[in-house]
Amino acid sequence: MSAAMMLASCGGTKEAGQNGALIERSDIKIEGQRMTPEALWAMGRIGGLAVSPDGKKIAYTVAYYSVPENKSNREVFVMNADGSDNRQITRTPYQENEVTWIKGGSKLAFLSNDNGSSQLYEMNPDGSGRKQLTNYDGDIEGYSISPDGKKLLFISQVKTKESTADKYPDLPKATGIIVTDLMYKHWDEWVTTAQHPFVA
C-alpha cells in the first residue's frame, strides 16, 4: 500500500481554496544603472531544486511577489542539466514548493495549498497529470518519501500548549492569552505550536 493511500484517510474533505489573482514575473526596469527596491521585488526568488535520478533534468521553484497585494506565488520549473529547455510547468494562484523526483524520475512530488491546506501532490515532469496524494487534517510543511515509495515522513505543526478555548470550552470565542510564566524567547509572537515528524 502506498504512503499516499495510507494518508488519504487521515482527514476529511477540504474546502476548496479561494482563487486569487495569478502573480507572475514582472518586467524588471533598471534606470540609470541603479538597483531599486522595485527592481528587487520584481525579480523571481529561486527556491529548492531537485536533480532527476539520471542527472539529466533539474526541477526547481521560483517565487514571484506582488507588493500591492503583499503576497507571493511560487511555481515549478524544469530544465535540462545543461540549462537548456527551461520550462514553467505550473501556472496557478497557489503555492507549489518542496519539489522532488519520485518513481525513478517518472513523476514529480510537491506540496501545494490549492485545497486550503498544504498537501502532497504528484505530476508528470511536463506538468500534466496533477494528482493530490494526501488529505491530512493540517498543513504538511516538509516531507521525505522512502526509496521504495511505501513510507512517507512528513512534518506538521502540533499544539504545545492548551489555548484559552481548550481550557474553557464554555468560552469558544475567547481570544485572550493566560500567561503563568515568563517568556523564553524574545520574538514578537506567541509560540503555541511546534514542528513534529510523522510517519505513514
Task: Identify the residue ranges that each predicted region occupies.
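Hydrophobic beta-strand positions that form the internal "hydrophobic ladder"
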Residues: G55-A59, I89, G105-A109, L133, ...
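Bacterial signal peptide processing site
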Residues: G11-T13
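C-terminal motif of bacterial Sec signal peptides marking the signal peptidase cleavage site
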Residues: M6-S9
